[in-house]
From Swiss-Prot:
Designated name of the protein: Probable cell division protein WhiA
Pfam families: HTH_WhiA, LAGLIDADG_WhiA, WhiA_N
Organism: Clostridium botulinum (strain Hall / ATCC 3502 / NCTC 13319 / Type A)
Keywords linked to the UniProt accession: Cell cycle, Cell division, DNA-binding
Role: Involved in cell division and chromosome segregation.
Amino acid sequence: MSFSLKVKNEVCKHVEVNKQEAIAELSAIMKVSGTLLFTNKQFNFKITTENAAIARLVFKILKEHFGIHTEIMIKKNNSLKKNNIYIILISEEEGVKSLLKEVGIIKETINVFSLDYNIPKSIIECDECRRAYIRGAFLGGGSISNPEKTYHLEFVTHNEEYAKDLSNLINSYNLNSKVIKRKNSYIIYLKEGEQIVDLLNIIGAHASLLELENVRIMKEMRNNVNRLVNCETANLSKTVNAAVRQVESIKFIEREIGLGRLPKNLRDVAELRIKYPDESLRELGKMLNPPVGKSGVNHRLRRIEKIADELKQGI
């Protein structure tokens, strides 16, 4: 089961809603996944989904809050590995015109009906109604990527005006959703893990929220470990390269003039470095008599390298 499907199934089990919340949630579902039909001079409205849980939720809301008794039709999807398609058809006999006005899909002016592409302010007046609306929009046209791979949550709609309205509603919760056009659709999206967590909280997907948070924590830990390993690897590489360079310089001096020509403090360090090529500067310093600190050992080895360079240049 995809993470997106898991979130939607969880959201469909949301606690009971009151009439105003039901209006907001159903309005969003109908706006993003419904089709208004006008045949034989009659209005019909079709809601289509591939998710059985969403179809059952719509059926329940229509029955309990609007007194509309309809049926869920199941259509086999012939495409390979595709889910069934669930269709809820609301006819004029079932009061579709009244429903469409109540949920803000159509508006009437002097007996003329027209589609309302905005989110009616009257159905999102309270906080719970706003949350219900965003929840419905996610159920109808939302999706979320597998957080193991990437952080991306989006809503798909076909009207730019509506997309901007929905984005503004989402952003009223201190989020930063953006709107882009993709072919013939408008996409409202969030890409930051923390903001996606906040949106899951808004729509009531608390179990999915915790799962995403766990993934975020694990990814952050892995990234921190990787950064630490990379840093230590880089430091180790520098240390090894420096040790190799020091040993080569000491051996060159030994061949050219002999280590006996070096001052005693440099000769002692040179002999220890040849004998212990893998030891750190701090450990080499402890072996000297008297002991010398890391910076002191480093200074002496730099002087040895400088002497080797001068010998190579014939100075």
